Amino acid sequence: MAGAKEIRSKIASVQNTQKITKAMEMVAASKMRKSQDRMAASRPYAETMRKVIGHLANGNLEYKHPYLEERDVKRVGYLVVSTDCGLCGGLNINLFKKLLADMKAWSDKGVQCELAMIGSKGVSFFNSVGGNVVAQVTGMGDNPSLSELIGPVKVMLQAYDEGRLDKLYIVSNKFINTMSQVPTITQLLPLPASEDDDLKRTAWDYLYEPDPKALLDTLLRRYVESQVYQGVVENLASEQAARMVAMKAATDNGGSLIKELQLVYNKARQASITQELTEIVSGAAAV
């Protein structure tokens, strides 16, 4: 029965793990709903800012802000949003693969890349592969604030202001639904012109008070900050959804494994009983 005892021990171990994954699935489901609420609350502001900036990028402005001007590209920067925790399926690695492919495309053109990381998984991954990480922030928890994110944003904006970066992108997962999260790379600077046909057909005239430079400096920085914050809350909702799905799959796989082990245990026990009966019958026949 040594084999049967070993199998019983494995079954108990899988059952304990199954309880943990089931609990993590339920926690992730609860956190996902809260993350979706935050994402839905901030999305209108981010989208409105994007529309306003789209008007500016399409317009003929009396003052041309540096954030609106295309440059010869020698260095590009990425604000990379990843998770602080694992156990969320392929969410991070799919994002990193997309980013590495984009970085390689720039590298083949002789363009250098700098990375500002939001989330510990991105920090550890790109440090291990030799990425040029110039800023990082980790441990933001389940309710990140803009003040926690502002460090890497300031570093990249300062580099852009000083001409050390010619393009700036944000890299994050876009939440579609519980089963679908899409890795995206979105250009922040220089500001891309709006792709909305209605905006392209509309002529916009702006009056600036008191000064266009001061107003645009503030507005365009707010735009970048809003897009980064939206990327973070969308990535957080994606993380919880991916973790919930991964933990459900682990729980289901645990159930299947328990059934297989139970079948093996029953066969081992049956074989042991058969052997004992055979020995008893053989002994009786010998007598």
UniProtKB/Swiss-Prot annotation:
Gene Ontology cellular-component annotations: plasma membrane; proton-transporting ATP synthase complex
CDD domains for this protein: F1-ATPase_gamma
Subcellular localization: Cell inner membrane
Xref: Pfam families: ATP-synt
Protein keywords: ATP synthesis, Cell inner membrane, Cell membrane, CF(1), Hydrogen ion transport, Ion transport, Membrane, Transport
Principal localisation: membrane
Disulfide links within the chain: none
One GO process term, biological-process aspect: proton motive force-driven plasma membrane ATP synthesis
Record's bilayer topology term: Peripheral membrane protein
InterPro entries in the cross-refs: ATP_synth_F1_ATPase_gsu (IPR035968), ATP_synth_F1_gsu (IPR000131), ATP_synth_F1_gsu_CS (IPR023632)
Annotated GO MF terms: ATP binding; proton-transporting ATP synthase activity, rotational mechanism
PANTHER family linked to this entry: ATP SYNTHASE GAMMA CHAIN (PTHR11693), ATP SYNTHASE SUBUNIT GAMMA, MITOCHONDRIAL (PTHR11693:SF22)
Subunit structure: F-type ATPases have 2 components, CF(1) - the catalytic core - and CF(0) - the membrane proton channel. CF(1) has five subunits: alpha(3), beta(3), gamma(1), delta(1), epsilon(1). CF(0) has three main subunits: a, b and c.
Protein function: Produces ATP from ADP in the presence of a proton gradient across the membrane. The gamma chain is believed to be important in regulating ATPase activity and the flow of protons through the CF(0) complex.
Protein family: Belongs to the ATPase gamma chain family.
UniProt name for this protein: ATP synthase gamma chain
